[in-house]
Amino acid sequence: MAAAAVSSLLAPSGSCYSPGCHSCWGPGPGGGRRLPSPRRRPITAAARPTWAVPRRSRLEWGRVEAQNSGARTSCRAALQWLSSTARSHVNVGYGSPLVFPGLTKPGSSRCLCVVGMVGNAGNQVGDDSDDGIKVTNEKLRAVIRKSKEVLEIHRNLLEKISASERKKITSIIEDSSIYNEQDPFGQRDSSFYHLDEVPDDDEFSYDLQMYLDRRPDQSEVVATQDYEAQLSQISEMGQSVAEGTSDDPSASAAVDLINIILVAAECAPWSKTGGLGDVAGALPKALARRGHRVMVVVPMYKNYAEPQQLGEPRRYQVAGQDMEVIYYHAYIDGVDFVFIDNPIFHHVENDIYGGDRTDILKRMVLLCKAAIEVPWYVPCGGYCYGDGNLVFLANDWHTALLPVYLKAYYHDNGFMIYARSVLVIHNIAHQGRGPLDDFSYLDLPVDYMDLFKLYDPFGGDHLNIFAAGIKAADRLLTVSHGYAWELKTAEGGWGLHGIINESDWKFQGIVNGIDTTDWNPRCDIHLKSDGYTNYSLETVQAGKQQCKAALQKELGLPVRGDVPVIAFIGRLDHQKGVDLIAEAMPWIAGQDVQLIMLGTGRQDLEDTLRRLESQHYDRVRGWVGFSIRLAHRMTAGADILLMPSRFEPCGLNQLYAMMYGTVPVVHAVGGLRDTVEHYNPYEESGLGWTFEKAEANRLIDALGHCLNTYRNYRTSWEGLQKRGMMQDLSWDNAAKLYEEVLLAAKYQW
């Protein structure tokens, strides 16, 4: 009985499931198939298995914990487990080649084969005695020790090699790992096998070539070097660099480079209504600095100066209508920006989320359908991204259809099976809700209706696009720890808390960063004219005074250096608490302050801005619309930033404000609670003021304390400014965490 059980585990007879063995089920990440889990729990980059059993096993496998390395599974732990449970029925032999991705030459080393006794006598090297097992274990330890030594040498070399040289090496390795029909997998003597190379003819994309730098001197790929020459080149480069660890942020990512395609409805500086546009414009650059190949796909709302047409036009059917898409491309700061052009996007240039429900839905359907095929049909830098090493990063409900399409159109039909999707929740309040009849616009099989159907106690069954995306995505993210907690509650989940709690195993929060090349008072291009000035931590007092005077002059306010300037920048809707400011306006108007508000959104709230300006013209300005230049200048010239949001997933404006020495007053919710520490006058700590309830009187109380400190305790005020400016708010920190999630999705099976 036991022999039969072990034999069924290890079928087919004589197979080897160690990393890089090509005679079994084919390589997964690291060579072998991934260990199945009853809950499909993902495997993080730091805990990736180096040994796994075949997926066709019907037994439920528990997780094998490795005590030393923290990995979920390892060769040693797995084989010890097998030894303890079926010692007399399993022997260890040496068989197929052990290939370490990008390092080990096929045939230069031998790998461990775990084989059943039945029908495998020719592969046995031990016997059922303790002596045989002891010899086997010694051989195991020797092979594992040698493997670890080789991999450690490789990692050390990568740490020493400069970023530019590493890119050259990666190009060499990547080129030699491209599969082609004339050279079947594993037949070339000189090939380097890449971590994610896939040998299946039907499933592998031929456009997997990775390019990391398009400069002519680095785009030439050497395809004819043999193994020894490549390894020698790596060693020479590593030895030519001084001892020490590289400070280059891509160093830690060099071993696990992936292709990332971020898809969003907006992207700064081309289109922006809120924080999503900033994230789409800045996060990809930080990921690219870590060595990954990164693309951003967004609609083309008008004619932009930078992009150029690339690739052939494609046609997609949306709601029964054929729509032609033209792809435009720009390469900026190491990132490919691809714009989806169709007349359906043009008429919403000034309000990208405008129009009726069905018009918006059609735009998002077209965006997702076109974006998911970009890695096949848009040869950025001459090479398509391909789908063998690919993770899509979708954002909010606008692109929540992408994980669903990836599954329905491709995975279910055997295509792009190694591509993964991650969905980021920026704002759960906007969900893409509609009647069930809207399902006809999505062009999906009828059996996918249940994925979208959600019951609302007030409206009955309805179609919910965000709900479907959350269920279909391989990983789920949101933009702060506080918001991640709120989304699991009935109050903060907006009806999706149940689905999010069910997906808790794949869900986490990562606090956003900011683009410190764009938002930086030292080099802000919007402060170089019209009387504004750049400034630093050392010159913040004089610099902000000059920017305040220039801002007052530009907007037609009295130029007074002693009056505190309060700014509000954001979308005009119920979430942002604009009505709380209006309710507190009688008190604010009596405080000898100037209030400047910038934003666009609901018509009634736009009218509120105009009304407040007309009623208090000597001290209030309400700018309806959005101007990136004015947003930068307001952040530099204001003393206080007001953010009374009822809920705020992360918020970026408070981060921009602190970077510029502007003190935030915020409602303690979501990411605002995570990023703005309440001021403590006794310990001289904190970054601003917070209030606990979204009520006008609480806003007045917090703002009153802030104004009192500004007028009467200048030393404390300057301390607040300096502490805010001294923080590291860059995207590089957040990008490391995003990278871990993307890799976890990539290795999820």
From Swiss-Prot:
Keywords: Amyloplast, Chloroplast, Glycosyltransferase, Plastid, Starch biosynthesis, Transferase, Transit peptide
Alphabetized CDD domains for the sequence: GT5_Glycogen_synthase_DULL1-like
Record localization: Plastid, Amyloplast; Plastid, Chloroplast
Tissue localization of expression: Expressed in endosperm, leaves, and weakly in roots.
Gene Ontology MF, one: alpha-1,4-glucan glucosyltransferase (UDP-glucose donor) activity
Associated pathway: Glycan biosynthesis; starch biosynthesis
Catalytic activity: [(1->4)-alpha-D-glucosyl](n) + ADP-alpha-D-glucose = [(1->4)-alpha-D-glucosyl](n+1) + ADP + H(+)
Record has ATP-binding as a keyword: no
Residues that hold ADP-alpha-D-glucose according to the record: 272
GO biological process, one term: starch biosynthetic process
Similarity section: Belongs to the glycosyltransferase 1 family. Bacterial/plant glycogen synthase subfamily.
HAMAP family: Glycogen_synth
Identification of the protein by name: Soluble starch synthase 2-1, chloroplastic/amyloplastic
Organism annotation: Oryza sativa subsp. japonica
